[in-house]
Regions:
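Extended ligand-binding regions for polar small-molecule ligands
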Residues: 59-63, 109, 174-177, 181-187, ...
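Bilobed "Venus flytrap"/periplasmic-binding protein-like clamshell domains
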Residues: 76-85, 95-112, 146-147, 164-225, ...
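Periplasmic-binding protein-like
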Residues: 81, 162-174, 246, 253-293
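Bacterial lipoprotein signal-peptidase II cleavage site
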Residues: 22-30
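Acidic, polar ligand-binding/catalytic clefts
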Residues: 104, 115-182, 265-266
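C-terminal motif of bacterial Sec signal peptides marking the signal peptidase cleavage site
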Residues: 17-20
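A ligand-binding cleft/hinge motif common to bilobed small-molecule-binding domains
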Residues: 128-129, 143-155, 198-207, 231-269
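Extracytoplasmic small-molecule ligand-binding "clamshell" domains
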Residues: 59-64, 70-142
Length: 293
């Protein structure tokens, strides 16, 4: 049986998930008893019936987003070449990372579903352009770890979540800070137009009863990406903290950058989905196909 893409994604991001696993009791097997030999009935040959051929999905409306993608034989996917470990350029200047692998699998399965192989064209618009909608047909889909928020859902259509994201806070490696309260009024860097910027402003609208309260009166500095924040920190810019994806922060630590993850648990947990522009061609058939993958 083919595994759903969401199941694969969830397994691949196990470090991002909080799961409680209980051990089930092993059932006691009853002793085997030998059944009496069955009397074989005379064989009668049933007339052969041909199983109905399985049909693929109906051809989509040519004016829909899905119809246009299939007609072009190409899907244009927005990504960020500076968002390791989710999407980045490797040493050979090829795209790599969790979101890149996910996008490649989406294109493969979508093409197989309609028997039309799809080529990928990578697009690299800025994050604020992606999250603000009104893409003007410049790309077809965002597969770039976009968190689902009420504000974003007003301008983009979200498919079913493909994983769940934990927010975190990075502090300098030698910092003595142990709580968010100690960051009140401090300098905090954040990626522009991200859920972390919204969280610091007290404007993040997600369903998470355990979302932590942001530090009061923080002096927020938004840069184009949170990776630019940690690079600025490494070059001596001197932020007191960086609000970012917890998995990304752990990656910075592994790379030897001068930060550590503040040990306070997730600041919030949010679902992450593929996004389609609501102002573009109709997205209904594309959403249905994505949710079947």
């Amino acid at each position: 049986m083919r595994k759903s893409l969401r199941l694969i994604a969830l397994a691949s991001t196990a470090a991002l998930l909080v799961a409680a696993c209980g051990s089930a009791a092993t059932p006691t097997q009853a002793p085997a008893t030998e059944a009496p030999a069955a009397t074989e009935a005379p064989a009668t040959e049933a007339p052969a019936t041909e199983a109905p051929a399985s049909e693929g999905p109906a051809a989509p409306d040519p004016e829909s987003l899905l119809g246009k993608i299939l007609a072009a034989g190409k899907i244009r996917i927005s990504t960020d070449p500076n968002y390791k470990p989710f999407s980045f350029l490797d040493d050979n200047q090829k795209y790599d990372g969790f979101d890149i692998k996910t996008a490649e699998e989406v294109a493969k399965r979508l093409g197989e579903m309609y028997d039309k192989p799809l080529e990928i064209e990578w697009m690299t618009p800025s994050w604020d352009l992606i999250t603000s909608g009104k893409w003007g047909g410049r790309w077809d889909i965002s597969i770039g770890s976009m968190s689902v928020t009420k504000t974003r859902a007003e301008v983009v259509d979200f498919a079913d979540p493909y994983y769940y994201d934990f927010g975190g806070v990075a502090v300098p490696k030698d910092s003595t800070v142990t709580s968010l309260d100690e960051l009140a009024g401090k300098r905090i860097c954040v990626g522009s137009s991200t859920t972390y910027e919204q969280w610091l402003a007290g404007e993040l609208e997600i369903i998470d009863p355990n979302m932590l309260k942001p530090p009061a009166g923080a002096e927020v500095t938004p840069l184009e990406t949170d990776n630019l924040c940690v690079q600025a920190q490494a070059s001596g810019r001197g932020f007191d903290a960086i609000a970012a994806n917890a998995n990304g922060i752990n990656d910075w630590v592994k790379e030897g950058l001068p930060v550590k993850l503040l040990d306070i648990g997730p600041i919030f947990t949010v679902s992450v989905s593929f996004a389609l522009d609501r102002s573009g061609p109709p997205t209904g058939e594309m959403l249905t196909a994505l949710n079947k993958i």
